[in-house]
């Protein structure tokens, strides 16, 4: 790819956005931009990773992320294979070690893993010679989602993160997406606000480089983008939030809220959406919504991620 020969990707694995420098994030976003252009062509497949093997190991249910990675690999001409969770034994560390040995025997070039346990991706990365890409581990991290969100915002903000403000709204306590976006966007120079009921804020959030609100009307003032998060309905059963009607009356993002945001402010949602709970249907379908753009961005961004990790120079760094 253009300029790739002059930039050596130093990381064997992508486990968390915290491992990436600002320059590396910018390079990845620029590369994703090239793949995004390719994806607009009538023929979208390129021979870039022909002969490479990508294994999709999803030990947690996923439709969007798994499909996005599968499409990304196929558009790069890689051979992609899916390995599904089989039984409860994969949850335990010893069985995950056995799984790592099984995967190693397949001689893949990249393994994409999603797992219910925080740290599962790192566990594999420390035991495998091939590249490991974290597609979400427990509540810990979801680096590829944060990178695709940054790619969507990069396009919407004309490449300028400095001086921009993103509001993240909803169930932040249980969101690996929120954690990864906070780390990535603040590293790129953006400001981040959080808005949620106190019961849905993570412990230690007051030490993050963010502003925290529990009032949406105040939180949305002057922001350049709002990311509404999926409300995990099982949290209501755990007593962490009131009934859905009361939650929606206070935290469902709508067109009226966006009138108080900065001119041209955009709306994001990592999906799947609970319309009328986290975001109104009218706003989700409005012109300022980037929800469908995030889906397209996901394929291009994951093409860049697979390309970098399947072709990187062997520096020994993680």
UniProtKB/Swiss-Prot annotation:
Keyword Transferase: yes
UniProt enzyme class: transferase
GO cellular-component term (any): cytosol
Molecular function GO terms recorded: amino acid binding; aspartate carbamoyltransferase activity
Pathway: Pyrimidine metabolism; UMP biosynthesis via de novo pathway; (S)-dihydroorotate from bicarbonate: step 2/3
Enzymatic reactions: carbamoyl phosphate + L-aspartate = N-carbamoyl-L-aspartate + phosphate + H(+)
EC number: 2.1.3.2
Annotated positions binding L-aspartate: 92, 176, 230
GO BP: 'de novo' pyrimidine nucleobase biosynthetic process; 'de novo' UMP biosynthetic process; amino acid metabolic process
Domain of life: Bacteria
Record key words, sorted: Pyrimidine biosynthesis, Transferase
Residues the entry annotates as binding carbamoyl phosphate: 64-65, 114, 142, 145, 271-272
Keyword Chloroplast (UniProt): no
Task performed by this protein: Catalyzes the condensation of carbamoyl phosphate and aspartate to form carbamoyl aspartate and inorganic phosphate, the committed step in the de novo pyrimidine nucleotide biosynthesis pathway.
Assembly and binders: Heterododecamer (2C3:3R2) of six catalytic PyrB chains organized as two trimers (C3), and six regulatory PyrI chains organized as three dimers (R2).
HAMAP family: Asp_carb_tr
Record PANTHER family: ASPARTATE CARBAMOYLTRANSFERASE, ORNITHINE CARBAMOYLTRANSFERASE, MITOCHONDRIAL
Family that this chain belongs to: Belongs to the aspartate/ornithine carbamoyltransferase superfamily. ATCase family.
Protein name per Swiss-Prot or TrEMBL: Aspartate carbamoyltransferase catalytic subunit
Annotated organism of origin: Oleidesulfovibrio alaskensis (strain ATCC BAA-1058 / DSM 17464 / G20)
